[in-house]
Amino acid sequence: EEDLKKGLKEVGLAEGRVFNKSLLDRVEQELRQQYFGRGYYAVSIQPTVTPLERNRVDININIEEGASAKIKQINIVGAKEFSEKDLLSQFELTTPGWITWYTKNDQYSRQKLSADLEKLKSFYMNRGFLEFAVDSTQVSISPDKRDVYITINLNEGARYQVSSVKLAGDFTISEEELAKLVVVKPGDVFSREKLNESNK
């Protein structure tokens, strides 16, 4: 509640300020989006404005969060080289299981989904798929706003191998010694992780 009051004050809704109805409407929409982003699709936000004496108003924002929506299904479309099970094992988000009552990883969050998509990209980039891309993600909610269905459409692209490794620059130690430190070798499947190790 204190964080909410602080946020309202920052946007101009605070005691002593001139009341602006359009600003209150914008705050309501932003609050709704914040709750949606955390998986609370059943949230109810009811602002009420009560006129007081001496041209003042009393603003009350009643929020009922409701239950957070649970992930019912995650589908990955376009994967050919890896199984959906292997790809979903990279994700923090998951469907309800015996431990999710504790981890809450079955509760949809826009931020968590973005982080999981980054993990998916790293998974592919470390296995030679330089052109990997997530073409689209669809998040749909059941009519009762309790279940979330996620569909991820991806394009794996081609798998690349390292054809050659060349060292360039002025070296204080021999090129042979430096070559021993290079993790990436010709013929290896390209890996962004290995390339970063070699750069250290």
Spans of model-derived segments:
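Interaction-mediating elements
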Residues: 1-200
